[in-house]
Each structure stands twice: as C-alpha cells, then as structure tokens.
From Swiss-Prot:
Native source species: Rickettsia akari (strain Hartford)
Keywords annotated in UniProt: Ribonucleoprotein, Ribosomal protein, RNA-binding, rRNA-binding
Top-rank taxon: Bacteria
Known partners and oligomeric status: Part of the 50S ribosomal subunit.
Cross-referenced Pfam families: KOW (PF00467), ribosomal_L24 (PF17136)
Record GO biological process: translation
Gene Ontology MF: a single term: structural constituent of ribosome
Alphabetized InterPro entries for the sequence: KOW, Rib_uL2_dom2, Ribosomal_uL24, Ribosomal_uL24_CS, Ribosomal_uL24_KOW, Translation_prot_SH3-like_sf
The keyword Cytoplasm is annotated on this UniProt entry: no
Function: One of two assembly initiator proteins, it binds directly to the 5'-end of the 23S rRNA, where it nucleates assembly of the 50S subunit.
Record-given protein name: Large ribosomal subunit protein uL24
Length: 109
C-alpha cells in the first residue's frame, strides 16, 4: 500500500483523462484502492428504485478517480504541484508544495 499525500478537504486539479482541468475538493479518500472522490468531477447519473426511505428517481453522484490522475493546487500560485514532507523547528511534520514551499497542511489526524 502506497503512502498517500492527499487528505480530505485538499484542493486538487485533474491532470489527465476525460475530466482534465477540473478543480475540486477531496470529499473522500480510499487508501486501499488508491482512489479519491473529488467534488464535481466524474459525475454519473444513477437510477434508484422507490423504497420506504425515498421516492426513487435519478440522482447524480461522484465516482472515485485514481490518485495518479490528480495533483495538488499550489495555495500561492494556483498551479498544479507535487507535495513534499518537511519537519518544522517545533518538531511537527507538515506537507508543503514543492513549487512555492507553501504549507498545505499538517501530517496526522
């Protein structure tokens, strides 16, 4: 299993495939499959039968895409960037954008 550098809530851009160029936030991460669900990307229409809980109909939902098809958005420039890990002076480990050196987020829960 690969260590993922993406977390829920990260801003990403799709860099390849049918949805190339679309931006969105990560809604859910599937580390065992190396896939993520990005808001507004890879939308499909699903037909549901009526049941006791809902009336049924056609719903639109996002499907997972592979993490190799996305890149983080640099918070400083807005361009796609790779992510590196860096230890700060206080001992905490953070994720930083390689292009600008801007901090993306802390590592851990």
């Amino acid at each position: 299993m690969v260590k993922l550098k993406v977390r829920k809530g990260d801003e990403v851009i799709v860099i390849t495939g049918k949805h190339k160029g679309k931006k969105g936030k990560i809604l859910k991460v599937f580390p065992e499959d190396s896939k993520v669900i990005v808001a507004g990307v890879n939308l499909v229409k699903k037909h549901t039968k009526p049941n006791q809980m809902s009336g049924g109909g056609i719903i639109t939902k996002e499907l997972p895409i592979h993490i190799s098809n996305i890149a983080h958005i640099d918070p400083k420039t807005g361009d796609p960037t790779k992510v590196a890990f860096k230890c700060l002076d206080d001992g905490s480990k953070v994720r930083v954008a390689k292009k600008s050196g801007e901090i993306i987020g802390k590592v851990g829960k």
